[in-house]
Amino acid sequence: MTANATYNFAGKTILITGGAGDIGKATAQRFAVNGAGIVLLDLNESKMADVAQALKEYRVPVSAFRCDVTAAADVAKAFKQAIEQRGQIDYIFNNAGYQGTFAKTDEYPEADFQKVININVIGVFQVLKAAAQHLRSMGGGAIVNMASYAGVMGPPNMLAYAASKFAVIGMTETAAKDLAAAGIRVNSLSPSLIGPGVMWTRQTELQAAVGSQYFDRDPKAVEQQMIHSVPLRRLGSLEEVANGVAFLMSDEASYITGFNLEITGGQ
């Protein structure tokens, strides 16, 4: 990844939840290449350690802490550790999430619906609250919540995920109004079809398995059906998502708050 001179994050620190995932890693790289220190939070300590190791080439401070975003005590502990180690956090990318089961509405399992809501709504709330408290004490900063285009248009067979991401967009709009006077900007990001990566592979395989009227039963055919729905006729890249996060955090977006940035290729 090459540096983009538009953004100078030297001397700043970004905290990224879901730091062991594909988007978390790409975003960490995007900020590190422009000088930001990185704090990773995730439940998967092994994968998170791999990401931290990969960031060493950028010669910026990197910290990693285990955190269950659904647990307020865990989030508070992770923020305390990060602040004690780094002094302050300037940006928070509220990125941890879970796609959940793919199933028709009348067949959707209640237990998995609850799990999706716990991670994608309660988890985002816990991190958003902790981030707001810290940034208020620092006199301001920026938060980006990971939503999804599923929270804009409601895709088939993704009932819980769509519900959770609609909620994230709503929380973002309210938090932006509540926190503006404290100098805290809050925006959300809604990618649509992003790949290659773990979530893209999972999505095509599980949509095919549902057997709905919308998609073929062959994952490869589903992949082509999805790409054909994009006016630009390609997937978005992880780096393009990371670029969206960087823009929303940067001074270039200093008059933008309460905004949901759609990264959709024109969908």
Model-predicted regions and their roles:
Residues 7-39:
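Canonical Rossmann dinucleotide-binding motif of NAD(H)/NADP(H)-dependent dehydrogenases/reductases
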Residues 103-105, 109-114, 226:
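Substrate-binding pocket helix/loop in short-chain dehydrogenase/reductase
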Residues 125-128, 136, 232-263:
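C-terminal substrate-recognition "lid" of short-chain dehydrogenase/reductases
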Residues 128, 164, 172:
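Active-site helix of classical SDR
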Residues 133, 177-178, 254:
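Alpha-helical segment proximal to the catalytic Tyr-Lys
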Residues 148:
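Residue(s) in the substrate-gating loop at a strand-loop-helix junction
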Residues 180, 185, 256-258:
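Short, small/polar-rich loop/turn modules that mediate ligand/substrate recognition or access, typified
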